[in-house]
């Protein structure tokens, strides 16, 4: 039986909450489309502080894989198709239908552009599925490759080089998009370092925890320092906030390590709630943007007090998503929508 690692339960829940907060801050910016000057710059830097959610999910996904497996079978892939890819498609069908009604456009057009090409918030699942295939291939070659510092360094160079030229070289950018049919955010070269970082940390997990026990404060200082590096590299486009950026790679990576280190100190705090958020995190990720606009129409009245706005919005979103998930959980067939993790919850403990 796999050991339950409480710090990873807390970590997954916190990353889930961070992604919701990122989208809430985006809603505020979109509402004030005429924002400019100091207000726009301030919003830009605040939003980027919490932009590390998606990279952290990629790191965590591969960390869990190399932590829990030393070899895999073909079932490793089929399980992820059933409980990750199929929910992505089914929720994508619902999203595409609702968008076609909202925008009075073709359902087929919405489904192709959003779900198949990855031009929606669920693009992250397309990236993850590519990494599942890559992980399977590496397992079949040699599990110990996940422990390679050389591969880790090369992946960092590859990701940074790709993102730098993709951002700053118009010819390179246009050539890539000419031959790559999906959304640019799904190109794995822009995320490859996070994959190998998660793999390396999962392979050396106990050593990572020992390191964080001694040097967590140093990692926090490094996180602050790397964010100032990002500020120094900012190009003046204060509307575009994305984790698909070479200037944020060090910050995103170190923030994952910092949050993991902080989570090692949590044992029982809000544990029942944290356990539910963690178990339903995949479903929350897919569902919350669908309800976000409608909920924001109410919670934006608290916008002048940002912390109150975020707290109330986060509470309602988590409550609605988990509530819907708990009802669907009563029927085993809905594992193809909410995933399999919610079925591992011990409801009698609540």
From Swiss-Prot:
Role = Presumably involved in the export of the biofilm adhesin polysaccharide poly-beta-1,6-N-acetyl-D-glucosamine (PNAG, also referred to as PIA) across the cell membrane.
Instruction: Kindly list the cysteine pairs connected by disulfide bridges.
Output: none
User: Organism source for this protein?
Assistant: Staphylococcus aureus (strain NCTC 8325 / PS 47)
Q: Which PANTHER family match?
A: O-ACETYLTRANSFERASE WECH
Null mutant phenotype reads: Deletion of the icaADBCR genes leads to the inability to form biofilms, produce PIA or mediate N-acetylglucosaminyltransferase activity in vitro.
**Localization, UniProt:** Cell membrane
> Where does the protein principally reside?
membrane
Chain ranges passing through the membrane: 8-28, 40-60, 83-103, 119-139, 146-166, 182-202, 216-236, 254-274, 276-296, 308-328
Q: How does it sit in the membrane?
A: Multi-pass membrane protein
List the GO biological process terms.
Answer: enterobacterial common antigen biosynthetic process
Annotated signal sequence is none
What Gene Ontology cellular-component terms does the record carry?
plasma membrane
Record-given protein name: Probable poly-beta-1,6-N-acetyl-D-glucosamine export protein
Similarity-based family:
Belongs to the acyltransferase 3 family.
Pfam family name, one: Acyl_transf_3
InterPro entries xref list: Acyl_transf_3_dom
GO MF term list: O-acetyltransferase activity
Keywords from the UniProt entry: Cell membrane, Membrane, Transmembrane, Transmembrane helix, Transport
């Amino acid at each position: 039986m796999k050991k339950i690692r409480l710090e990873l339960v807390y970590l997954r829940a916190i990353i889930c909450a961070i992604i919701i907060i990122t989208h809430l801050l985006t809603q505020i910016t979109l509402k004030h489309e005429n924002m400019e000057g100091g207000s726009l710059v301030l919003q830009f830097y605040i939003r980027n502080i919490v932009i590390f959610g998606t990279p952290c999910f990629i790191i965590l996904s591969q960390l869990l894989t190399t932590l829990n497996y030393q070899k895999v079978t073909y079932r490793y892939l089929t399980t992820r198709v059933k409980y990750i890819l199929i929910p992505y498609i089914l929720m994508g069908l619902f999203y595409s239908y609702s968008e076609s009604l909202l925008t009075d456009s073709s359902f087929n057009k919405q489904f192709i552009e959003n779900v198949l090409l990855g031009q929606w918030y669920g693009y992250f699942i397309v990236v993850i599925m590519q990494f599942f295939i890559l992980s399977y291939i590496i397992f079949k070659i040699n599990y110990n490759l996940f422990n390679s510092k050389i591969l880790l360094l090369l992946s960092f160079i590859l990701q940074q080089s790709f993102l730098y030229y993709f951002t700053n070289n118009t010819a390179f950018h246009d050539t890539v998009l000419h031959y790559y049919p999906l959304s640019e955010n799904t190109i794995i070269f822009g995320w490859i370092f996070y994959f190998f970082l998660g793999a390396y940390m999962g392979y050396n997990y106990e050593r990572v925890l020992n390191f964080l026990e001694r040097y967590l404060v140093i990692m926090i200082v490094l996180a602050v320092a790397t964010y100032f590096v990002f500020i120094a590299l900012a190009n003046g486009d204060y509307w575009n906030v994305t984790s698909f950026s070479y200037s944020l790679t060090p910050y995103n990576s170190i923030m994952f390590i910092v949050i993991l280190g902080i989570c090692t100190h949590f044992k029982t705090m809000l544990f029942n709630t944290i356990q539910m958020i963690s178990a339903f995190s995949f479903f929350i990720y897919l569902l919350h943007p669908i309800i976000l606009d409608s909920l924001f129409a109410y919670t934006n009245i608290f916008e002048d007090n940002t912390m109150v706005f975020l707290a109330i919005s986060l509470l309602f979103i988590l409550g609605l998503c988990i509530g819907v998930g708990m009802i669907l959980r009563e029927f085993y067939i809905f594992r193809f929508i909410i995933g399999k993790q919610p079925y591992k919850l011990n409801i009698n403990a609540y």
